[in-house]
Amino acid sequence: MKKCLLMLPVIHADETVLQVNKEPGRTPQQESRIWAYSSSKRSKHQIRLFQYEMSRKGACATNFLEGFRGILQTDGYSGYGVIGEIIRAGCWAHMRRKWLEAMPKGATVENSKAAKGYEFCGRIFDVERKLEDLPDAERAVKRQELIKPIIDEYYAWIETIFKPSGKLKDAVTYAVNQKEFLCTFLYHGEVEASNNQVENAQRGVVVGRKNWLFCDTPKGAEASVIAYSILETAKANGLNPEKYLMHIFTVLPDRFAKNPNADIEDLLPWNDKIMELCKLGV
């Protein structure tokens, strides 16, 4: 599945905290990471892959994405800046969240700059929803026609904000530093306005973590991310995860016993036979 993912034109990426108790040379309190990678909403084959790493360094993503030459859509984490030979796309949902965090209670567009910034983001998403079903090329043209003027107005307005402080400063700084990446989607119709695709893919991990709390060993962490990759990819392709697991666990042992390098393309979640056998509701 990783090989298929790296061939796609767009990949979404994000990471979240993981506690692993028995990592060599580290205390249980030190944070590790689960890195998440997803195909785009427009991809024919939906892929969700998770990688366990001891670090949040951008080198983790660089190593995982070796050979990828497309567009990487992420939040504003600076670590992605070390990845070469890609185009980066930003996330307007994160931008909007920055304004929301800066908004005082009872804020309105008339009395709060944060509320005004939040409204700008809402206008962008309102137009974006209307363009969702357009082909890539047409969507890019329409974005430049309908959304670019809003973004131009947005950044002209940001320049009028004098000496912001606190969370308002954080929002303004994010907007300025991420401008190039926040504008990528205007010219690439295959790119979404937000990175919600991969954030949604991580929901199972985040919710599950509240129950299982930690992984005891690195081997357990590796096993967990493999399981999540299989299950979340199956779900993303409309499969019944239980049926899918039962099928591959029935087929794989005998196949690998005969040939450890056996082809498994017919077992990928989007294979026609797999869809027929394991689709939800069947």
Q: How would you describe each model-predicted region?
A:
Residues 1-282:
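Catalytic center-proximal scaffold of phosphoryl-transfer enzymes
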